[in-house]
Amino acid sequence: MEIDTPIRQLYEQILVAWNQRDAAAMAACFEEDGNIVGFDGSQADSRAAIEDHLRPIFASHPTAPYVAKVREVRMLSPEVGILRAVAGMIPPGTSDINPAVNTIHTLVAVRNAAANDWRAALFQSTPAAWHGRPQDVAALTEELRDVMRRGVTCS
């Protein structure tokens, strides 16, 4: 197994939990003192706060599922890694990615020695608006459509 595989798996677990609208499963991917920064800039600071933040979103909003492509996984130490990815969303009732909500994901993952697994210390979604560069938005959207067509959440 490559050294970055557990971090990629953690990222996919986060996406799958989001896609299944499962606040508890998504929060379980985080350290007790983990942080999340949403696409809209909202923040939740702690595993419990992340679950509390996501529960009403999933209960009252038809959240769109993600498809994503990992750009880089870089180890900062044997216990800390950064994953950078691009992601798109397929709005409910549609079959295509909405370029207006393409995002850049950043995951800071830490090895949890006690549990012998990896957890998110920070997960951030930043809009991939790329103002004034519609060709870049179109290229990213096509790249994400390729992932979507393969029927996978993440590549």
Q: Which residue ranges define each predicted feature?
A:
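Helix-loop segments that flank and shape redox-cofactor active sites
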Residues: 32
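A beta-strand edge to alpha-helix "cap/lid" segment located at domain peripheries
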Residues: 1-25, 35-155
